[in-house]
């Protein structure tokens, strides 16, 4: 069984995330959407909200499982018997950052990182941008799924 973990804070879930997830579904038997938790990090949305965003968006997709985890992503992958870490790349900066992490993860665990390029109309979307636009009262609706818009 080909199983991948797509880790993130999903604060909030964006159409950039769903673009990567939806395009990865045919590649894997199961994709675990893994919300990493860090008690020293401030989040805009509660863990419960972020779980709801993911579960509601993928409630009809049998290949998707939603979990939370603490600690190293590779340790979580091992606990789930996942052989791959799925990551999205928006630009060259993402590539350099993710390449370094991916190589380190592989050295530590033998777990490969699989990178998908963002679709051309989604490369500008990030949770950071969405949070900033929301904070300043701007229109963010074109960057997030319906479940986030309703929150």
From Swiss-Prot:
Residues reported in the UniProt entry to bind ATP: 9-10, 17, 88-90, 98, 122-128
GO molecular function, one term: pantetheine-phosphate adenylyltransferase activity
Reactions this protein catalyses: (R)-4'-phosphopantetheine + ATP + H(+) = 3'-dephospho-CoA + diphosphate
Cofactors, names only: Mg(2+)
Entry GO CC: cytoplasm
Site (Transition state stabilizer): 17
Coarse class of the protein's main subcellular location: cytoplasm
Annotated metabolic or biological route of this protein: Cofactor biosynthesis; coenzyme A biosynthesis; CoA from (R)-pantothenate: step 4/5
Superkingdom as given in the UniProt entry: Bacteria
Annotated compartments: Cytoplasm
Family from the record: Belongs to the bacterial CoaD family.
NCBIfam families assigned to the protein according to its UniProt record, in alphabetical order: coaD_prev_kdtB, cyt_tran_rel
Role, per record: Reversibly transfers an adenylyl group from ATP to 4'-phosphopantetheine, yielding dephospho-CoA (dPCoA) and pyrophosphate.
Subunit structure: Homohexamer.
Protein name: Phosphopantetheine adenylyltransferase
């Amino acid at each position: 069984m080909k199983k991948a973990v797509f880790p993130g804070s999903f604060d909030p879930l964006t159409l950039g995330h769903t673009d990567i997830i939806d395009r990865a579904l045919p590649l894997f038997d199961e994709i675990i959407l893994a919300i990493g938790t860090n008690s020293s990090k401030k989040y805009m949305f509660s863990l419960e909200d972020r779980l709801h965003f993911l579960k509601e968006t993928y409630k009809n997709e049998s290949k998707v499982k939603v979990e939370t985890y603490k600690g190293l992503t590779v340790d979580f992958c091992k606990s789930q018997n996942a052989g791959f870490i799925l990551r999205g790349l928006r630009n060259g900066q993402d590539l350099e950052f993710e390449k370094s992490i991916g190589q380190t993860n592989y050295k530590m665990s033998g777990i490969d990182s699989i990178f998908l390029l963002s679709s051309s109309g989604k490369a500008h979307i990030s949770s950071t941008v969405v949070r900033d636009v929301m904070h300043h009262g701007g229109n963010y609706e074109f960057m997030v799924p319906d479940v986030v818009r309703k929150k």
